[in-house]
Amino acid sequence: MLFFAVLRSFGYDFYPVIVKCLFGSSDPVVPTHCAAIVTIDGISYYTDVGLGLPSPVVPVALIEDQGWQPETISPNFYSYKAHLNGNNVMLEGYNVSKRMSMVSFVLQPAELVDFIPLNYYASMAETSPVTQGIIVEMFTDRGTASILKNKLRISSDDRAEERILETDDDLKAALWEVFGIKVSGE
């Protein structure tokens, strides 16, 4: 994985973990995501890329009562707080409009081979968010842009705009105009 190769090239001490993406769900959630726990000066941090939904924009220190990270609560990004129960960790997310459980994981190193069945499930299961629609997210210096299923959300400068992409042409136009992704064919 590219993220792990980058961490390794900079000499970081890290290990992969298997993550459940909760996003406030009260239903049982299958673990389908990979993140890394990086240790710096004896402190473990949750680091994540490629989540496709609101993921931490900074490494989150896994210290109980650490407070929100980053400290500034913004409508454009979620701030995170770690809740630890032994080796079990839940990260709570908060922005100006929502506060909810975001991800959970166990502080146990995973092997990359452990992700093969998770990747298969995420790409094939009817209940997987990946098979239910498009997931795209991009961070900018002023906010985020995302498409989840058929909803386009653009956040910048403390404002958020949402709109439903009603047709395939609307989706293709948004992918091109907002993300620079050109889709051809059906």
Predicted feature locations:
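His-Asp-centered catalytic microenvironments across diverse enzyme cores
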Residues: 19-163, 169
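Cysteine-centered nucleophilic/redox motifs
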Residues: 1-18, 36, 136
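Generic C-terminus detector
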Residues: 168-186
